[in-house]
Amino acid sequence: TVKERSAVVRFKVVGEDAYFLAWTTTPWTLPSNVALCVNPSDTYCKVKSVDGYVYYMAEALLDKVLGKLAEEDKPAYEVLETYKGTDLEGKSYVALYECAAKEAEKQHKKAHYVICDDYVTMSDGTGIVHIAPAFGEDDARVGREYDLPLVKFVDEKGCMTAETPFAGMRAKPSKAEMEKDPNVKSADPEVLKDLDAKGLLFDAPKFEHDYPHCW
């Protein structure tokens, strides 16, 4: 098992002073994000958080994600509205990275909106999953269903491409590689740093998982 940092990211809702909170275990895939996925039949809430932001996320995970923000005299959040996942389908958000918006335009495909699929679970994260169809089976499947653009900002060597602000950094260097060459730069911490500087990183919790190292 590998201990890594995941990311809970703020995606700005178009036309609203609010954000979708989405979780990913692979921050290096975020520049290739083209959609956010919710479970169609689960309940989602729009909440005013004590941190001053308005968030959309799954009702079942509110306390797990926002609970730690609670102050002595203030609850962590106040529920403003409640939705079914299907109510959020089609809602647009601002692309995290300009490169993905440009690539979607080039492919003449709609991107950066909410889609629905049953594979989204309420066991961890925020109940909203970031979708990059070039990476991951479920992402690829829902990408085909919604005809999302295929955006892949990682080359065959596993390096981030020049379109991104992380050109040349390794998307997923193995531990052995990192030890062998101290100059190998992993994209994950840099993506987290960049999002943090933009005020878009809500949290970067550590987690453990098994990771197959292959391209």
Where do the model's predicted regions map?
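Residue patterns forming the tRNA-binding/recognition surfaces of aminoacyl-tRNA synthetases
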Residues: 1-31, 43-45, 90, 99, ...
